[in-house]
């Protein structure tokens, strides 16, 4: 008997449980129709965990994740918990500790504009007529967000604050290797984003990326300063394949790429460590304003599951089938509210049913 692949499911808050229910439909098909040996266990996280147990990341949840091969995450947070100190709120007290505990140093954020949804993009039609497919590879555990010293103080000149951008060569090497490896199965292009005309950390970044690139002669490497990159993405997004970014630059660029697709409800993400253990989640938030209305778009959650199948289970063919099922649903004209004309749209559960049907029929 094949060893079961263990998935910890953390639905979370807001629309998290609603869109996770649609991902469960896909998981059930993978078990029954594709004969994947899966062991799925669900745990509480975020605000709902605070309400139940007084903490956003309960010990049982952390241990459950430790005993799993991957984490499928929903969303956390909401105004209900804004009274708490920032460090105790659902977002800060669950996601960040999980990333740190499992050393999830890389964040993968695909931004794809489907040809049938070109009208959603805020960019002109002549810019997006061919669509685009960008993968932002962001270093997640180093850089200015974690560098020390940082703080706030006063002197004779007044009050001041400071942060420190620190990158070690090994941190740059491992994220660069991942970007090149991912590019080799895409269009074989990596564009590294830095600010090496100003920042010492970016000078090292560019040097290390150039060094790593010598191991991948089939990959075309280019470099852009962060300010120029932001402009080029607006001007011609289809020129890009894989974007390799430091923590802060990746934070900026990935959100820009997300917005020009027209709907963040379509976008998945993955955070991986060196052993391909990953946390997979939609790029959007918990959207408490539409919680319980059955109008949330479940596609980002379903595509996050597809990324789990691809990167942690290494089952590219099955992941391709899930992606294709999503595309076929869109091609057939099915739309949730966020990607519709506001009049003709289907509910959250209906979109999940339709994608599941395409997956079964396309097996």
Swiss-Prot record:
Location of site Important for catalysis? Answer: 145, 195
What EC numbers are recorded for this enzyme? 1.1.1.85
Name the cofactor(s) required for activity, per the record.
Answer: Mg(2+); Mn(2+)
Q: What is the lineage of its organism?
A: Bacteria, Pseudomonadati, Pseudomonadota, Gammaproteobacteria, Enterobacterales
Q: Does the keyword Cell membrane apply?
A: no
Q: Which GO terms describe its cellular component?
A: cytosol
- Keywords per UniProt: Amino-acid biosynthesis, Branched-chain amino acid biosynthesis, Cytoplasm, Leucine biosynthesis, Magnesium, Manganese, Metal-binding, NAD, Oxidoreductase, Plasmid
A GO biological process of this protein is:
L-leucine biosynthetic process
List localization entries: Cytoplasm
Spell out the family assignment given in the record's similarity comment.
Belongs to the isocitrate and isopropylmalate dehydrogenases family. LeuB type 1 subfamily.
Q: Where does substrate bind?
A: 99, 109, 138, 227
**The keyword Manganese belongs to this UniProt entry's keyword annotation:** yes
Task: Write down how the cofactor binds this protein.
Answer: Binds 1 Mg(2+) or Mn(2+) ion per subunit.
Record note on quaternary structure: Homodimer.
HAMAP family recorded: LeuB_type1
**Identification of the protein by name:** 3-isopropylmalate dehydrogenase
């Amino acid at each position: 008997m094949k060893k079961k692949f263990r998935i910890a499911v953390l639905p979370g808050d807001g629309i998290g449980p609603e869109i996770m229910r649609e991902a469960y439909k896909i998981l059930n098909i993978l078990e029954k129709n594709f004969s994947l040996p899966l062991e799925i266990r669900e745990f509480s996280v975020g605000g709902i965990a605070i309400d139940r147990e007084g903490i956003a990341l309960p010990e049982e949840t952390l241990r459950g994740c430790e005993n799993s091969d991957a984490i499928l995450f929903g969303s956390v947070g909401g105004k209900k918990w804004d009274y708490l100190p920032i460090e105790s709120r659902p977002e800060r007290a669950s996601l960040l500790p999980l990333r740190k505990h499992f050393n999830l140093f890389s964040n993968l954020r695909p931004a794809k504009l489907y040809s049938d949804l070109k009208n959603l993009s805020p960019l002109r039609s002549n810019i997006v007529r061919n669509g685009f497919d960008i993968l932002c590879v962001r270093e997640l555990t180093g850089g200015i967000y974690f560098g020390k010293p940082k703080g706030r103080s006063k002197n004779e000149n007044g009050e001041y604050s400071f942060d420190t951008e620190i990158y070690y060569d090994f941190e740059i090497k491992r994220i660069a290797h991942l970007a090149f490896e991912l590019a080799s199965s895409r269009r074989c292009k990596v564009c590294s984003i830095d600010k090496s005309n100003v920042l010492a950390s970016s000078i090292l970044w560019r040097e290390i990326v150039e060094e790593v690139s010598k191991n991948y002669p089939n990959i075309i490497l280019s470099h852009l300063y962060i300010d120029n990159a932001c402009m080029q993405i607006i001007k011609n997004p289809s020129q890009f394949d894989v974007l390799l970014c430091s923590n802060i630059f990746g934070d900026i660029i990935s959100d820009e790429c997300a917005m020009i697709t027209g709907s963040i409800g379509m976008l998945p993400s993955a955070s991986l460590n060196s052993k391909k253990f990953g946390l997979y989640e939609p790029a959007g938030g918990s959207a408490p304003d539409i919680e319980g209305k059955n109008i949330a778009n479940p596609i980002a959650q379903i595509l996050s599951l597809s990324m789990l199948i691809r990167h942690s289970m290494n089952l590219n063919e099955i992941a391709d089938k899930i992606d294709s099922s999503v595309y076929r649903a869109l091609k057939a004209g099915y739309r949730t509210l966020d990607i519709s004309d506001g009049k003709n749209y289907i509910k959250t559960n209906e979109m999940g049913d339709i994608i599941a049907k395409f997956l079964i029929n396309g097996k």
